Amino acid sequence: MQKVSLRKVKTPVSYLQENSEEVLHFSLQGLLPTGHTLALNTPLGTLSHLVCKDDRPQMLMEQQFTTSEICVLMPLLDAYPYYCPYEVLLASFNSGRASEAAIARSRKRLQEAQEAGIWDQEMRPVRNVLSRTRLKTRSFGIEISSILETGYILMHLPRYKHPEV
């Protein structure tokens, strides 16, 4: 007999409404060369790889992300260089923002899902979005790696050479 998921379907809230800053910058030391920055334009859903050359910013590449993809990418970028727990990703995915209350609710839901034997079903929508996000972050030389029974972490993609200016 198939078990039913505890997940309630919600559309992620746009970061445009939740975030006062329209463009967020991430230096990601260890993932990007010195002087390189990722700029996430939350209203447009674009992630740009920037470098400053001759005191002028230059864009090396850019990728477009959906709202759902931004909802899982933001907590990963915020957590770097540390891992991002499953409950934080689930909270951000479901509500568009990983507040302490949302994280506590997600932690409880995941514990209940684990006890009911439907943990995989509960996390499947997040994993599907992470899979699409992973394909896009690879163009920046960034891998989204799974840590068994813990969460996800951003890592340098092996054999990736960052574009020259």
Regions found by a protein language model. Give the residues of each.
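Sequence-level detector for tyrosine residue identity
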Residues: 15, 80-86, 152, 160
